[in-house]
From Swiss-Prot:
Belongs to the TatA/E family. One of its GO terms (molecular function) is protein transmembrane transporter activity. Disulfide bonds: none annotated. The chain crosses the membrane at residues 1-21. GO terms for cellular component: TAT protein transport complex. The lineage of its organism: Bacteria, Bacillati, Cyanobacteriota, Cyanophyceae, Gloeobacterales. This is Sec-independent protein translocase protein TatA. Coiled coil: none annotated.
Amino acid sequence: MPFGLGLPEILVIGVIALLIFGPKKLPEMGSALGKAIRGFKSGVSDEPAPQQSASKETAPNPPQSLPSGKDS
């Protein structure tokens, strides 16, 4: 289990949350939390693609020599 929490600890946390927020508010909060997590995951997965393309576009060009017209 994540963070070293077993089933008994998760059940105790669930019962405490149920007592604090009530049976009507708890499903609404769970739904909002799920939407927030989905939004965060989609934002994180979309983030690396623009950074990679931006780094390719901003790569420095090699210096070009200009014709001087003078013979040395």
